[in-house]
């Protein structure tokens, strides 16, 4: 399941929910789309409860789910995560050239000048900038470098993403690692 957003407070008398969007693709939030709600740290599918989107107002970040129609029902979902299946996300979200689903980037090797620095284990958004969290290769850790480091998803650091080769080529990322 892919995190779409975090559910905030209840809004209005009809079960509206403030949605703090975590996705770059709000167009996926369409009437009739199946989503799931669960705690943000949910690991079990039993934790997920399925809903269907009634409507989403992007300008107000206001989400309405078909079976949630009172403020009391909406409050029960406050502080939970809104998720969508990877299959559903890929079906609904059309990517442009050079755009990627972050779930496809997890596990890719990070390579600079033919040296593998590590692999992407997570992607974090900090103050509107996305960062690749990279687990450093064992041989570099044994040389005293950090076990984990962050690479900003910016052209200065990211040279090329090659999904078919399962790697991300970088510039200046080794300097980040050495200074971590």
From Swiss-Prot:
Q: Which GO terms describe its biological process?
A: ribosomal small subunit biogenesis; rRNA processing
Q: Tell me where in or outside the cell this protein is found.
A: Cytoplasm
Q: Chief subcellular site?
A: cytoplasm
InterPro entries in UniProt: PRC-brl_dom (IPR027275), PRC_barrel-like_sf (IPR011033), RimM (IPR011961), RimM_N (IPR002676), RimM_N_sf (IPR036976), Transl_B-barrel_sf (IPR009000)
- Assembly information from the UniProt record: Binds ribosomal protein uS19.
**How does the entry describe the domains?**
The PRC barrel domain binds ribosomal protein uS19.
Could you identify this protein by its name?
Answer: Ribosome maturation factor RimM
Q: What is the lineage of its organism?
A: Bacteria, Pseudomonadati, Campylobacterota, Epsilonproteobacteria, Campylobacterales
